[in-house]
Amino acid sequence: MDPVTTQPAKKNILSYLLPRSGGEANKRLKVGFIYENTPQTSEWCYAHELGRQYIDETFGSQIETVSITNVRPKEDDYNAIQRLIDDNTDLIFVTSPSMMYASLKQAIAHPKAKILNCSLNISHKYIRTYYARMYEAKYLTGVIAGVMAKSDKIGYVASCPLYGVMANVNALLWGQGR
């Protein structure tokens, strides 16, 4: 007779971000998204909105999602985050790197709040950041640009002044091979 081996239950990403115990274990999670623009006018916001909709479709009644659009950095970002905190939002995605300082201020002021900002290289115990490894795609784009370019000159339009932009430019140039 072969013994039956039982695999331990796999934890999903939410269990790492939002450990729960006791009466909280059955509580419906509330996840908020803060957008600088609207999903209709910004591809960046639209991509995050697709993620929000995927959460709704996948988790159904287990997770409630909300979003706030047209939040201006350095003007009403702090208050938008505060509104979600006041509404007992468990996890807040601030989708603009331009709102990092408001995110960090709120994370420090409300250490129990789980705030993630879409940006790079902020190391602080109260906030987490996330961002795609865009340099990999930029490297491949550089390879294509290098093959197609008729001269040694190519252009790059940077989206915003953040740490990762220079890594993207460097990857593009490495890929181009010049």
Where are these regions (language model features)?
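Signal peptide-proximal N-terminal region
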Residues: 53-66, 177-178
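Short, low-complexity disordered leader/linker segments with a strong preference
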Residues: 1-28
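Hydrophobic alpha-helical segments within soluble ligand-binding/sensing domains
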Residues: 130-152
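Periplasmic-binding protein-like
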Residues: 88-97, 116-118
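Extracytoplasmic "Venus flytrap"
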Residues: 18, 31-51, 55, 68-75, ...
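Short, well-structured alpha-helical segments in soluble
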Residues: 74-90
